Amino acid sequence: XXYQTDELARVLSPT
């Protein structure tokens, strides 16, 4: 990605 909210959301996803 281009460093969007989805990228961080899945990377910081607790599960």
Swiss-Prot record:
Protein's name according to its UniProt entry: Autoantigenic sperm protein 4
Natural source organism: Vulpes vulpes (Red fox)
Note: On the 2D-gel the determined pI of this protein is: 5.5, its MW is: 16.4 kDa.
